[in-house]
């Protein structure tokens, strides 16, 4: 199962700091930052209080107003690049602060657990970024300084990302192991079930309820959700309601009008399935209360998905992945990949060589080659574009949760899945589901065990 993308399920959308799962075939490096150094966007100066002050304390470590504002700058940049309309500023600031609290608690756990990122690992990450920008390390640092960054802070960010990645891999991955008995049970259930597995695409408005909310605050938030529900059932445009009411932290969900994606039913929370079981396409659910808050669900699509056919069309593709980061905007990544495409089309460059030099995926060493893939092995947005290509054709840059891709389809063939291949496909699916569930539980546990004191609200 080498060289495979593994998608995060919709269950993780309610978290403010979702796990960056090292995908098979798109495995992030210790520092997932890429080409094109960019100065951070500017946010208007804080007023009323001093420019910097403590807004929260996680155990014994403070989070300052400036930290929140710097993180907010990055989020605003990403929202603007995605063409996302304006989001309620108070809601966004609250989400950014909560994300920083979660990350702070996880970083503390990493250090307490003896996880470390030595200078050699950070040096390597910095060298990779410089190489991807076609710069020396000295030139990279000068450019960061010119664009308002601080090289020392940049290295600290790299260190934190390495720590978080190593912690999550150590703590969460073991909880998602799939046994042979689980595979056997799944296959037996599929063979004995008469109806085909259903696939559902939902959109949601999420009015978040903080863990610390008082009964009065919960009542007010429920009333807000009820207003959104009434307008949805009155026929107002759901996308407009998402933009006005939704507190969903997943930026891709907000940009897509709250759409959660076409998934098999078992990849949605049971609460969602219960609320939408008897709804037709286009209908709106009643208010759903979860640990994250109040949800309003709209059924966008329902269809049956039969078990995988014994004979399938396999595709072999290669790709170049550039990861979006504070140093590489989505727009800059698209421009860079478009330039690569032009160079290959003009015979000035080789796709595999470009992948080896620039791709930020584990397949880079193989020239971006992802190997032969069965249907369903890649995330939907990647697979849809790949399936539209003819052998030899190169796609336009496309965005997935992993970053921005340039895909070249190499060849296609008809193949019969062996029993072992079927088992491996089931293993990957069950692992993905368990990984989502394990991360949600783990992240909530880490957050719950931390002492968090909220002070002056950020500005």
Curated annotation (Swiss-Prot):
EC no. given is 5.2.1.8
Q: Which GO terms describe its cellular component?
A: outer membrane-bounded periplasmic space
Q: Name one GO molecular function term.
A: peptidyl-prolyl cis-trans isomerase activity
Q: What's one Pfam family here?
A: Rotamase_3
Intracellular or extracellular location(s): Periplasm
Q: Which residues form the signal peptide?
A: 1-23
Q: Which InterPro entries match?
A: OMP_Chaperone_SurA (IPR050280), PPIase_dom_sf (IPR046357), PPIase_PpiC (IPR000297), PPIase_PpiC_CS (IPR023058), PPIase_SurA (IPR023034), SurA_N (IPR015391), Trigger_fact/SurA_dom_sf (IPR027304)
The family database entries (SUPFAM superfamilies) matched by this protein are listed as: FKBP-like (SSF54534), Triger factor/SurA peptide-binding domain-like (SSF109998)
Q: What class of enzyme is it?
A: isomerase
Question: Source organism's superkingdom?
Answer: Bacteria
**Disulfide pattern:** none
- The main location is periplasm
Q: Where is the PpiC domain?
A: 197-301, 312-411
Reactions accelerated catalytically: [protein]-peptidylproline (omega=180) = [protein]-peptidylproline (omega=0)
Query: What is the official name of this protein in its record?
Result: Chaperone SurA
Organism encoding this protein: Albidiferax ferrireducens (strain ATCC BAA-621 / DSM 15236 / T118) (Rhodoferax ferrireducens)
């Amino acid at each position: 199962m080498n060289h495979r993308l593994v998608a995060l399920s919709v269950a993780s959308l309610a978290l403010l700091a979702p796990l960056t799962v090292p995908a098979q075939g798109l495995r992030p490096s210790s520092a997932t930052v890429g080409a094109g150094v960019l100065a951070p966007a500017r946010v208007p100066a804080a007023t009323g209080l001093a420019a910097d002050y403590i807004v929260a304390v996680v155990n014994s470590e403070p989070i300052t107003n400036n930290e929140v504002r710097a993180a907010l700058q990055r989020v605003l940049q990403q929202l603007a690049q995605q063409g996302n309309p304006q989001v309620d500023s108070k809601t966004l600031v609250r989400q950014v602060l909560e994300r920083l609290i979660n990350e702070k608690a996880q970083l503390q756990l990493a250090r307490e657990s003896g996880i470390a990122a030595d200078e050699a690992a950070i040096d390597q990450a910095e060298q990779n970024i410089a190489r991807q920008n076609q710069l020396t390390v000295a030139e990279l640092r000068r450019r960061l300084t010119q664009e308002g960054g601080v090289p020392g802070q940049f290295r600290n960010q790299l260190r934190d990302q390495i720590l978080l990645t190593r912690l999550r891999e150590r703590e969460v991955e073991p909880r998602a192991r799939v046994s042979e008995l689980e595979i056997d049970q799944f296959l037996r259930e599929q063979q004995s079930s008469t109806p085909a597995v259903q696939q559902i695409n939902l959109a949601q408005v999420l009015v978040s309820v903080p863990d610390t909310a008082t009964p009065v605050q919960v009542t007010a938030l429920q009333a807000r959700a009820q207003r959104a529900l009434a307008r949805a059932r009155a026929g107002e445009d759901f996308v407009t309601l998402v933009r006005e009411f939704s507190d969903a932290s997943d930026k891709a969900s907000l940009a897509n009008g709250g759409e959660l994606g076409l998934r098999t039913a078992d990849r949605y929370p049971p609460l969602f399935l219960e609320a939408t079981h008897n709804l037709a396409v286009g209908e709106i659910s009643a208010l759903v209360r979860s640990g994250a808050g109040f949800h309003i669900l709209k059924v966008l699509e329902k269809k049956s998905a039969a078990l995988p056919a014994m004979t399938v069309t396999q595709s072999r593709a290669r790709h170049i992945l550039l990861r979006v980061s504070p140093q590489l905007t989505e727009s800059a990544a698209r421009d860079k990949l478009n330039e690569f495409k032009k160079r290959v089309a003009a015979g000035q460059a080789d796709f595999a060589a470009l992948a080896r030099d620039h791709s930020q995926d584990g397949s880079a060493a193989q020239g971006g080659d992802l190997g032969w893939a069965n249907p369903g092995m890649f995330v939907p947005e990647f697979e849809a574009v790949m399936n539209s290509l003819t052998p030899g054709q190169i796609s336009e840059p496309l965005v997935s949760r992993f970053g921005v891709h340039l895909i070249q389809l190499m060849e296609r063939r008809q193949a019969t899945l062996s029993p072992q291949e079927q088992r491996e496909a089931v293993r990957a699916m069950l692992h993905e589901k368990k990984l989502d569930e394990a991360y949600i539980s783990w992240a909530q546990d880490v957050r719950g065990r931390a002492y968090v004191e909220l002070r002056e609200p950020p500005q």
